[in-house]
Amino acid sequence: MKPAMETAAEENTEQSQERKGCFECCIKCLGGVPYASLVATILCFSGVALFCGCGHVALAGTVAILEQHFSTNTSDHALLSEVIQLMQYVIYGIASFFFLYGIILLAEGFYTTSAVKELHGEFKTTACGRCISGMFVFLTYVLGVAWLGVFGFSAVPVFMFYNIWSTCEVIKSPQSNGTSGVEQICVDVRQYGIIPWNAFPGKICGSALENICNTNEFYMSYHLFIVACAGAGATVIALLIYMMATTYNYAVLKFKSREDCCPKF
């Protein structure tokens, strides 16, 4: 029989080796996490959620403001109402698509990172896998350009509401020349092209305009459009990160498929 001290030493050695094995396994697993894609996914989900949620509510508030104050005749803004309703349905589609696309890109990031870092033995990748990675690179570039347009488009209602808000601030300022001067300060939304020129009243002046700025619909819509624009900007940044990650991984996969080499992302 072995002495008790020798048996205890062997048990301690085995336990330390097990702990070391678990630690190395954890480090290896963490090494396979595509951190760039993970950050981009979180940023993409947050940006799309802000853009879609805030944009949907802000559009509904905009319609309410137009109907109550700038275009009392329903037929004058019927086309605008249909367009806004269509945009709200498009928002549902955008949210669903990017939720799925973000998950797919994250999964693709895990696949390419594991392949590049050779976590599961020697480097292995197929022509189909490289083709799929290339497809994601192209699609992400297209979506990035498209979201740049969405970001610019989302700034338009912010600009419009800012003009109305700044006009109201001028009306509230003590420099306004009495009641007659205030009533000459107006906002005409027809100049933005969202309602036709024959819409009535189309133009609001003075104290009536100030009352619009004090409504909850105006306050909420203005700030929600700002948040929606910020969400669109966050989505653009997320897609830029996706572009860099997918392009780098695809390039390394192509390179390592010809000659086993080192880098990783």
From Swiss-Prot:
This is Neuronal membrane glycoprotein M6-b. Interacts with SERT. Keywords: Cell membrane, Developmental protein, Differentiation, Glycoprotein, Membrane, Neurogenesis, Osteogenesis, Phosphoprotein, Protein transport, Transmembrane, Transmembrane helix, Transport. It is a multi-pass membrane protein. GO terms for cellular component: membrane raft; myelin sheath; plasma membrane. The chain crosses the membrane at residues 31-51, 90-110, 136-156, 224-244. It comes from Rattus norvegicus (Rat). InterPro entries: Myelin_PLP (IPR001614), Myelin_PLP_CS (IPR018237). Highly expressed in the ventral medullary surface, moderately in the cerebral cortex and cerebellum, poorly in lung and kidney, and not at all in heart, skeletal muscle, liver, stomach or stomach. Induction: By hypercapnic stimulation (CO2 inhalation) in ventral medullary surface neurons but not in the cerebral cortex. The lineage of its organism: Eukaryota, Metazoa, Chordata, Craniata, Vertebrata. The gene is Gpm6b. The modification Phosphoserine is found at S257. One of its GO terms (biological process) is regulation of actin cytoskeleton organization. It comes from the Eukaryota.
